[in-house]
Amino acid sequence: MKNVSPSYLKHHFLIAMPHMADPNFAQTLTYIVEHNASGAMGLVVNRPQDLNLADILEQLRPDQEPSLLCQHVPIFSGGPVQTDRGFVLHPNGPVYQATVELEGLSLSTSQDVLFAIADGVGPAKSLIALGYAGWEAGQLEAELADNAWLTCPFDADILFNTSSELRLEAAARHLGVNLSLLTSQAGHA
């Protein structure tokens, strides 16, 4: 008997199908940070909030005026779970107090990365998110089987060099897909 290991989607994008009914994920592009037999974790990367880094720093460093640069660093809604918790995706390089290196990318969760970005000595490219998307064991696999998502290999250019409102379409184009031509009716071959 052949031993087949499961296929996991760590370091991939999930593209929400046009018929996605869940308002937390409709029209989203989600980067998958971790996916294994226990479940999955991801960050929505195309939903900026009405917050910027200056707003966050006012809470973290109330005695220090944030630089004007901080007003132009958006904060994204990373997902509906733990929306008070911050996550920073950035290229590999400096390691902060709480940094996990992924495949050519790092995820930092400590305040020092925010301070470094604010002070102009942090990663040149980053995405700051509050909250994350989480799936229990088997949940994401079931959603994929129900055609709720398309999967796309990660592309740093989409994450760091494409404006947030164009990321979903850019990921779909990476697959050769035009989302406006997709139907909610799908079959299984």
From Swiss-Prot:
Pfam families: DUF179
Recorded superkingdom: Bacteria
GO CC annotations on file: cytosol
Similarity comment text for this entry: Belongs to the UPF0301 (AlgH) family.
Name of this chain's protein: UPF0301 protein PFL_5830
Species this chain originates from: Pseudomonas fluorescens (strain ATCC BAA-477 / NRRL B-23932 / Pf-5)
Lineage: Bacteria, Pseudomonadati, Pseudomonadota, Gammaproteobacteria, Pseudomonadales
